[in-house]
């Protein structure tokens, strides 16, 4: 191939959006001071932080006082989920079987939880949370197969149980659904800088700090605010939302093409809902092929893709998401498109994939 490597792993981290880069460079010389201080530099930093919060609130259609900047999406997940659990005072966390490991680890830390099953598309298969649930954790869309969840519908039948929504995979790409009490998002997933997460807590939600508080601007999250990074994250989110319809339609058409052509390869299964899904990603599994070997060979040919869930790939364990769905767990590839992905890049990937799969199968005698 020509033109350098093709990055097809935007679901792990989207390249920095031009709006984020421009804003970050400009803010580095202005947002360094402590926004709690009353001197001029501190007041300037506070104004910048408040502006970032207002931009995020408008982009996500929430109130500015419902927005808290955190140091990562994982921290936002832990704060949001465990804060609702603590606010409920008793009961057990319930979570869908396809949640990100950040949710699973938080539930374990809180004493364990109840797993809610999903169907073969990865969608929650129950109408109401189990008895004794303190908080129900359901992602807005799955980070591995893209299937969206009926968040508003689940909330309507939750019987007063608060709902925590992990929106890290979808924020900016899809409008936030209704019905949640707290939610989390991650800047680098939409083209903002890494190291910035969003904790969203609805006005009136029964949320209490699950960890020691800090006397900062916003007591929901501890630590010194990274004002330049927060501004850059807000600028990227604003830009991504503004271009969402055009970019999303283009990505959806490209992914539709991938789903169709990949399914033509013998013994390949495409996972997730083909329609109600994130526009930019698709996961498929190849029987008789090792996922790590497939990713390595594709990388050698210039195509960067992922295998398995990002939360389990480093441990070389099968994807708990695919296992919960009852589909193939090995030999899987997740392809996810950047905002500027081109038809030629996708075509190039699809041209080399069949021969790579055939060669790897031949090496193991299948």
Show which residues each predicted segment covers.
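Pyridoxal 5′-phosphate
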Residues: 1-366
